[in-house]
Amino acid sequence: VYNWGEYISNGSDDSVDVVAAFEKLTGIKVNYTTFDSNESMYAKLKSGAANYDVVIPSDYMVAKMIAEGMLAPLDYSNIPNSQNIDAVYRDPDYDPTNAYTVPYMLCTTGIIYNTTMVENAPTKWADLWDEQYAGNILMFNNSRDAYAIAAFKNGTSINPETPEEVDEVVETLKAQKPLVQAYVMDEIFDKMIGGEAAIGVYYSGDAITMIDDNPDLAWVFPEEGSVLSVDCMAVPATSEHKEAAEMFINFMCEPDIGKANAEYIGYTTPMQKVWDILDEDLKYSEIAYPSEEVEAKEKVFTALSDEVNSELDVKWSEMKSYDEGGSSLLFLALLAAMVALACFNIWRKLRKKTRNQY
C-alpha cells in the first residue's frame, strides 16, 4: 500500500490500527509506505522502481494515470462496500463510472497561521505576498498546489491550457520566493506546531491535526477560493495481488473503519454512513465540512496536457532554483570576509616577525 503520509489511523493516541486490523481479519501481510505529493508518487510508479498493489492518488492524477494505462479496472464484486460511497462522488469526470477508483477522502486547501505571530488574520491568498511575513511563510512543495495559489491570487484558472499561462503564474511565485521560509509538505507539521513559522498553506484535514496540537493555530479559507480534491484508492496495472488489493479497498469502506480514519486524520469522508457516526467535534467542524459559501468558490484540478504539464515541471524547477542573486551575494560576502581574515592573519604574523627581529 502506497499512501500519503499521516493519512490513515495507525493505532497511536488510542486510535484504531487499521492496517493491523486488516491483517488480523484476512491474514494478509501489508507492506505500508508513504509519499508526500502526487508527483513523487507518480514518478516512482512510472519509473518501475517499486511495485504496489494499492495507491491513493488525487483526482487530477487519477485522470493522468488512467490515460497512461497505469491503473487496473476494479472488480467491484470484491468491493461491495463501495456502495457506502455517496452518490454525489460516483461517476466523476476524472474517472467516469468509477471504473478505476473508489473515493477515500476529500480535502480543501487553505491558510493556517499562528495567532500569536500574526497580528491581523489573513483573508486571501494574496496575503502570502505581504512583506510583513518575510521569512515566516511556508509554501507547498509541489507544483500543482503552489501554482493554484498563485493562480487564485492572479484571478486566473488553476488549470492552465497554454505554456504562456504557466509562465505568467510562475512569475508570480517567483516574486514571492524571497519571502518564503521553506517549501514543505509533511514538514509543515513540526514547523507550525513548534511555532517556527507564522503562516503556511496546506490541506484542511492536516490543519485540524495541527490545531489540536497547538491551540494558537487557526485556519481560514481564502476569499478567492480553494482547491477541492478527492483522494482515491486504486490498483496499479502492475499489481501482482489485485484481489487482495480490492479486499483492502473494501475494508477501508467499512463504516467503522471509515470513522476511525476520518477521526484520526481529520479529513472529509465521502460516506454519509461514516458522517452519521462521527464524533460531534469533527462532524460539525467548519474546516472539514465548510459552509455553502466556501463550497461555492471551490475549484477542482483537471489533468493538464503533456505540453502544459512539461512546461509547469520546467518552470517550477527553475523557480525553485531562482534566488534573485541572494545566494550569490551571500557567497561573495562570505568569501570577502574569509579573504580579509586571511590577510589580517598574514599581516599579524609579519608584524610579529618584524618585532622579533628587533
How should these model regions be labeled?
Residues 138-142, 146, 150, 158-222:
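Ligand-binding pocket segment of bilobal, Venus flytrap-like solute-binding proteins
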Residues 72-83, 101, 215-227, 236-239:
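Short beta-strand->loop
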Residues 292-358:
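Conserved C-terminal helix/tail region of periplasmic/extracytoplasmic solute-binding proteins
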Residues 1-64, 190:
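Early extracytoplasmic/lumenal segment of secretory-pathway proteins
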Residues 127-141:
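Short loop->beta-strand "edge-of-pocket" segments that line small-molecule binding or catalytic clefts
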Residues 236-296:
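Mature extracytoplasmic/periplasmic domains
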